[in-house]
Amino acid sequence: MSMKGKETMSNEKIVVGKFGATYGIRGWLKVFSYTDNAESIFDYSPWYINQKGKWVEYKVESWKRHNKGMVAKLEGMDVREDAHLMTNFEIAIDPAVLPELSEDEFYWRELFGMHVVTTKGYDLGVVTDMLETGSNDVLVVKANLKDAFGQKERLIPFLEEQVIIKVDREAQRIEVDWDPGF
């Protein structure tokens, strides 16, 4: 695979989308965005593609809406054959390009690995994933091996003030008002 982008050394990247099939003969690709607003993927630049274990930097030359989706053309990718090599590759960005959030806002990735503890001090486990349900986000918490309630995993709604009492970034801890039996 020819690497037309610029190789980078930093390994911390966030996947924000994926390339689909080629579009046309001039190097365009379909883009599937994982961002809340699909078109927001184009606000983050440059993009990084993992090629042979290394992050390679690409800049978006142009993009447009097409039917119900989006297509993009990367700089230096001018023929269908080059674009075809990118099919199904994930699109990642450097976390530094994300906007700063206020003290009470969080990116999901910040919550992963945090310990979840009840207001009474019971350790429920560690956040391993988040789910988007439409009405509210949900913490997926992997329970401790010694969980007295026999739980392997808990789903805890991320409802601030009702369930989520405090998120302490520094201590990597989330305090919740939650019954360990659930």
Curated annotation (Swiss-Prot):
| Primary location recorded for the protein, binned into one broad class | cytoplasm
- A Pfam entry, by short name: RimM
> What InterPro entries does this protein map onto?
PRC-brl_dom, PRC_barrel-like_sf, RimM, RimM_N, RimM_N_sf, Transl_B-barrel_sf
Query: Which terms under GO biological process does the entry name?
Result: ribosomal small subunit biogenesis; rRNA processing
Q: Name one GO cellular component term.
A: cytoplasm
| Domain of life (superkingdom) | Bacteria
Q: Which GO terms describe its molecular function?
A: ribosome binding
Q: How does this protein assemble?
A: Binds ribosomal protein uS19.
The domain-related comment in the record is: The PRC barrel domain binds ribosomal protein uS19.
Please describe what this protein does: An accessory protein needed during the final step in the assembly of 30S ribosomal subunit, possibly for assembly of the head region. Essential for efficient processing of 16S rRNA. May be needed both before and after RbfA during the maturation of 16S rRNA. It has affinity for free ribosomal 30S subunits but not for 70S ribosomes.
What does the similarity note say?
Belongs to the RimM family.
Q: What is this protein called?
A: Ribosome maturation factor RimM
